[in-house]
């Protein structure tokens, strides 16, 4: 659980949830604008690498965290980006690297060591967990908004225990 005692922690929690639950890229979060969120239908629109708008479901916990940030912690600003820097001047992040910095600080606050750094680890983790839960590569690619199955295969870190679960048993002494 992310602490939310300070406004910056409220913001960081919402960002971490977007990364972990929706597998958004850091640039998706940096570019997210207030009017990209449809609160009535529970969806948000992201324009990923292709700049093609994709409409994604907004899970309740993620929506709640974003709303907490907007209502209670987001600095007053004319900037229409959802997430702003926590210190003046209050404007959007300049680069996705600032999101990676948030991930690193959150990891440090949580005492998490020995794991890869950066925000992209959440996309890898989401893909792996979906595959372990039985989702197909095509479904995972759709969720991650990949245009190519080869890209999804890179994210789909398959481990030996999972391979053993899906592998066919050795035929043994079957007649030829």
Whereabouts are the PLM-identified features?
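Conserved catalytic core of the tyrosine transesterase superfamily
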Residues: 1-176
